[in-house]
């Protein structure tokens, strides 16, 4: 770490020492890529507010690493995995999810998806074990006396560290497949009649047929699909803690869940007191563009520009597909800024420039930006919402298809299928989004909703973390459902008891009726005999 940031940490320690005790120590268990981009925004704000932030990351991390331009501390622990292992696994997951399993039948799709999830969580478990079983590391962290743990719920382990150190923890999360962790670890409510199951690509306005589809998805995820080897994780947690427990039981102790969406994006649904929505917390006003880029944008005149990015996880695409996309972009009057890392397409038009990196937020906030071509990642969508820019979605994997469905239902986007689209499909979608005023109007409506909040999303996220530190938790917000078994939660024991009572009453009444009938029959026979 540089001398500059060593001095910063010293000043932070001194300011905390002389303050009224408002500074806290935060331990972070992160997840890679866009998850880290979002979480890092929270951490930088915590540091700005004089909290000491330590990120626990492995030597195999590809995205979460020490930055000399940041006051965030990084505790790097060794692992037998390598950066190549992590990158190869991710590229395999992206390729299969984007181009293979999307064409599968229902059962085949979820069977392949489960295989991908199990491979992902194999690496997650390995990283967790390498951290938790590192006695030197655990001793060092325990002696630091952290006040709270901030963890991404997608990667289990943060809750285990919290149990080991006996400190409260807060989750940051977008979603998990089938809402597995949210339902089993958080007690979230998802009524299937109007809340679409994640990855079902449905809206909250479902027809009878769509409700059947949604129910099938729910039942499949609840009773068949396993996001990871549950028994293996439960056994690992029990061994580490020295008592019988489960992953979900440990997750239920979360003080707060910070969900990275908001009602400008979500369909309305019920949620618990210890859940808050902080979508778009990374968004901010646009800054000036680099000189060369600004000149290119200004050269577009009244036609404006289109911003095109498929995110940080897609580094290249096939030559055929790139040429098809470039051909469509060449036919619009707007200038195009395309985030692209690959061979220059032969059909690239004079109106299109390729960049390995784009200041996406600053471009979306530029007054000349007319549309955003996006893969549908949550971070990118929120930047478009923040600045009121209509979208053309090219979803690839994970929640991206659902994200674009949300924007389509709200009238701020159109979508095309990357596996089947032609130049004409992309061109028509772009023309519609740019030339039909309704898309811009709806995008601006979402933007106004996003900005009209009593507290900014970032301030709200930091508030809850500080709240948990101040009060040593937030137990008063956790519903009693967390302490109930599955049978108790669904009142199956009560229903069984009441059914038994009804059965007993029916049995007694039946016996009494039979007894009376026999008595009457005997009396009748006796009178007849007499």
Swiss-Prot record:
One of its GO terms (molecular function) is glucuronosyltransferase activity. Its EC number is 2.4.1.17. GO terms for cellular component: endoplasmic reticulum membrane. The chain crosses the membrane at residues 495-515. It is found in: Microsome membrane; Endoplasmic reticulum membrane. Residues 1-23 form the signal peptide. The keyword Transmembrane helix applies. It is a single-pass membrane protein. It catalyses: glucuronate acceptor + UDP-alpha-D-glucuronate = acceptor beta-D-glucuronoside + UDP + H(+). PROSITE patterns: UDPGT. Gene3D superfamilies: Glycogen Phosphorylase B (3.40.50.2000). Glycans are attached at residues 65, 103, 316, 483. The modification N6-succinyllysine is found at residue 136. Its main location: membrane. Keywords: Endoplasmic reticulum, Glycoprotein, Glycosyltransferase, Membrane, Microsome, Signal, Transferase, Transmembrane, Transmembrane helix. It is an enzyme of class 2 (transferase). Belongs to the UDP-glycosyltransferase family. PANTHER family: EG:EG0003.4 PROTEIN-RELATED (PTHR48043), UDP-GLUCURONOSYLTRANSFERASE 2B15 (PTHR48043:SF64). UDPGTs are of major importance in the conjugation and subsequent elimination of potentially toxic xenobiotics and endogenous compounds. This isozyme has glucuronidating capacity with androgens, such as testosterone, dihydrotestosterone (DHT) and 3-alpha-diol. It is also active on catecholoestrogens including 1,3,5,10-oestratriene-3,4-diol-17-one. This is UDP-glucuronosyltransferase 2B20. It comes from Macaca fascicularis. The lineage of its organism: Eukaryota, Metazoa, Chordata, Craniata, Vertebrata.
């Amino acid at each position: 770490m540089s001398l500059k940031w060593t001095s910063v940490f010293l000043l932070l320690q001194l300011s905390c020492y002389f303050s009224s005790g408002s500074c806290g120590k935060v331990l972070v268990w992160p997840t890679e890529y866009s998850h880290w981009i979002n979480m890092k925004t929270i951490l930088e704000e915590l540091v700005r507010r004089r909290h000491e932030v330590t990120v626990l990351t492995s030597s195999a991390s590809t995205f979460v690493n020490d930055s000399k331009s940041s006051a965030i501390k990084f505790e790097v622990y060794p692992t037998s995995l390598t950066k190549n292992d992590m990158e190869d696994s991710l590229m395999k997951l992206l390729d299969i999810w984007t181009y293979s399993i999307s064409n599968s039948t229902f059962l085949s799709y979820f069977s392949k998806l489960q295989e991908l999830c199990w491979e992902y969580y194999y690496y997650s478990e390995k990283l967790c074990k390498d951290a938790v079983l590192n006695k030197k590391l655990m001793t060092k962290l325990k002696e630091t006396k952290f006040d709270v743990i901030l963890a991404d719920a997608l990667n289990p382990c943060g809750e285990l560290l919290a149990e080991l150190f006996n400190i409260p923890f807060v989750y940051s999360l977008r979603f998990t497949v089938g809402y597995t962790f949210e339902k089993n670890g958080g007690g979230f409510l998802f009524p299937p009649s109007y809340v679409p199951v994640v990855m079902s690509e449905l809206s909250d306005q479902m027809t009878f047929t769509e409700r059947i589809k949604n129910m099938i998805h729910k039942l499949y995820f609840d009773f068949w699909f396993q996001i990871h080897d549950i028994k293996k994780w439960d056994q690992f947690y029990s061994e580490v803690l020295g008592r019988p427990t489960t992953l979900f039981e440990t997750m239920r102790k979360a003080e707060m869940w910070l969900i990275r969406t908001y009602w400008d994006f979500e369909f309305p649904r019920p949620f618990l007191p210890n859940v808050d929505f902080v979508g778009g917390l990374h968004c901010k006003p646009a800054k000036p563009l680099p000189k060369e880029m600004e000149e290119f944008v200004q050269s577009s005149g009244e036609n404006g520009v289109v911003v095109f990015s498929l995110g940080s996880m897609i580094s290249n695409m096939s030559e055929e597909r790139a040429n098809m996309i470039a051909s469509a972009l060449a036919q619009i009057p707007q200038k195009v800024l395309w985030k692209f890392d690959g061979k220059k397409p032969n059909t690239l038009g004079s109106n299109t420039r390729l960049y390995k990196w784009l200041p996406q937020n600053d471009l979306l906030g530029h007054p000349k930006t007319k549309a955003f071509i996006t893969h549908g990642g949550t971070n990118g969508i929120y930047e478009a919402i923040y600045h009121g820019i209509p979208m053309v979605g090219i979803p690839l994997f994970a929640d991206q298809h659902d994200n674009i469905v949300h924007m389509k239902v709200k009238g701020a986007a159109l979508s095309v299928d990357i596996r089947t689209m032609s130049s004409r499909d992309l061109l028509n979608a772009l023309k519609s989004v740019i030339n039909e005023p309704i898309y811009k109007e709806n995008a601006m409506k979402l933007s106004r909703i996003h900005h009209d909040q009593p507290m900014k999303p970032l301030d709200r996220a930091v508030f809850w973390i500080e709240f948990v530190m101040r009060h040593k938790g937030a137990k008063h917000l956790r519903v009693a459902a967390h302490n109930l078994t599955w049978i108790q939660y669904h009142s199956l024991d009560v229903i069984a008891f009441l059914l038994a009572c009804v059965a007993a009453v029916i049995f007694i009444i039946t016996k009494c009726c039979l007894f009376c009938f026999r008595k009457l029959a005997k009396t009748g026979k006796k009178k007849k005999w007499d």
